[in-house]
Design a protein with these regions (language model features):
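Bacterial N-terminal signal peptides
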Residues: 8-21
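Compositionally biased, intrinsically disordered low-complexity regions
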Residues: 10, 66-69, 92
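Mid-length scaffold segments of soluble, non-membrane domains
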Residues: 77-130
Length: 174
């Protein structure tokens, strides 16, 4: 009888401790700068048989709470076919599963395309391609008309949440 009583008390104590334990933190995103940025920066990106240069000034590296990186960069497609220029705006390298807007993206390297609406104030489409050029995912972007100084590529982090901006168009990164 004592064994059963002590087992019940022990089970209750474990249940109380588990209930009081803090919940797992949401994925906190931070921007990477300095030497860590330089180490993660990729000079050329391979897509559809081409090594396309990236733009360092238009590159963002984010780091999650798990220490895994997400690298976003615009591509310099001048000198490439009009098909490549129209299809790809940038690239993404992810070291873990991530949500880019509503699109789930697995670990790997991808090309990014942006299809802007007419008129320009509406939501655009961000398209994710594998390195062979096949469409992997698509998500809608938001348009931020109030953005004071839009730049070609930037990321903001507020309260651990990240937004990726391509000009005035943005998606949340998780």
């Amino acid at each position: 009888m004592k064994k059963v009583l002590w087992s019940g008390v022990l089970a209750l104590a474990v249940a109380v401790l588990l209930a009081l334990a803090p919940a797992p933190a949401q994925a906190q995103m931070t921007k990477v700068e300095g030497k860590a940025f330089d180490s993660a920066y990729v000079r050329d990106f391979y897509l559809e048989g081409n090594a396309i240069p990236t733009q360092k000034r238009n590159t963002v590296v984010l780091k999650g709470a798990d220490g895994k990186h997400l690298v976003f960069s615009l591509l310099d497609t001048s000198g490439y076919s009009s098909e490549i220029q129209q299809k790809y705006a940038g690239m993404i390298i992810v070291e873990r599963k991530a949500m880019v807007g509503a699109a789930a993206v697995g670990t790997g390297a991808y090309g990014l395309g942006l299809v802007k609406p007419t008129p320009a104030e509406g939501p655009a489409k961000l398209i994710v391609y594998d390195v062979a050029g096949a469409k992997v995912a698509e998500t809608a972007t938001q348009h931020d008309a109030k953005l004071a100084q839009p730049v070609p590529l930037q990321a903001t982090t507020t309260g651990g949440q990240a937004k990726l901006y391509l000009g005035r168009y943005w998606v949340e990164i998780k």
